[in-house]
């Protein structure tokens, strides 16, 4: 009986030692992206992409800085519109009806501030940010067997209240990169539904791997795909690029 108990205990220890932990998965993910030193050397990213809308190919330019400032510029029918803009204090975007820039409400701006440290990936320095990880049972999604991680970030504001900010990441077990991210929509007409972001076509740019295709959709629904054409890093930008016009 003692021998049987020892064998069972040994098998259990072997299983534990060989099992992946959430931290192991993130370490391999960061390494596969290019390594922490390389990622930390990046101060800015500019992506140029196109999205198909009603048969039209719409150009998009997205600029993000390590300090959290960001802006997306959309060219449509001869006009340029800004969306998702944040200058470190104010978040704003173009009103599609009036075609004039408008500041976002205080709640939206506060949520932008809270996620402004997620430059490149929320997983970079996640412990310093106070994020926590939980490894869940493996799942197959988009036809790929994946590690599933529950990522709890800083609380977000919804309808004036702090609520949990939880995302579920599905990491390809072979390449250790996320192929799907899911989150519950916290407010608005689609409150309670699950949003999905699907990543594919990872390519190397200056030693760092990026997904060159990204589809945003509701779970089990149709979505909008952005196809990236070029990515540049460490360009310098004037403060005015991100500022609300007139300030």
Language model features: what each stretch is:
Residues 20-31, 90-161, 188-190, 237, ...:
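Flexible, processing/modification-adjacent segments and terminal tails
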Residues 43, 68, 129, 165-167, ...:
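A generic structural signal for short beta-strands and their flanking turns/coil linkers
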Residues 67-73, 92-94, 114, 204-207, ...:
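Short, surface-exposed linear segments at secondary-structure transitions and domain or protein termini
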Residues 24-99, 132-137:
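N-terminal mature ectodomain segment of secretory-pathway/periplasmic proteins
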Residues 1-22:
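Bacterial Sec-dependent N-terminal signal peptides
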């Amino acid at each position: 009986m003692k021998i049987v108990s020892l064998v069972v205990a040994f098998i259990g220890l072997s299983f534990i030692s060989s099992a992946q932990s959430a931290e192991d998965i993130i370490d391999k993910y960061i390494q596969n992206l290019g390594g922490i030193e390389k990622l930390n050397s990046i101060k800015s990213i500019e992506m140029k992409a196109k999205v198909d809308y009603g048969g039209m190919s719409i150009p998009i330019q997205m600029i993000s800085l390590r300090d959290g400032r960001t802006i997306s510029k959309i060219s449509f029918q001869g006009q340029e519109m800004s969306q998702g803009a944040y200058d470190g204090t104010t978040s704003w975007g173009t009103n599609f009806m009036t075609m004039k820039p408008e500041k976002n409400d205080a709640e939206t701006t506060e949520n932008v501030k809270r996620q402004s440290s997620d430059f490149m990936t929320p997983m970079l320095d996640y412990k310093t940010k106070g994020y926590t990880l939980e490894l869940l049972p493996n799942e197959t999604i988009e036809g790929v067997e994946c590690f599933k991680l529950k990522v709890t970030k800083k609380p977000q504001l919804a309808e004036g209240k702090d609520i949990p900010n939880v995302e579920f990441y599905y990491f390809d077990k072979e390449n250790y990169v996320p192929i799907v991210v899911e989150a519950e929509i916290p407010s608005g007409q689609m409150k309670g539904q699950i949003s999905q972001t699907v990543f594919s076509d990872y390519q190397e740019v200056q030693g760092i791997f990026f997904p060159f295709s990204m589809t945003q959709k509701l779970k089990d629904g149709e979505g909008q795909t952005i196809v990236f054409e070029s990515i540049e890093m460490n360009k310098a930008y004037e403060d005015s690029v991100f500022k609300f016009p007139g300030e």
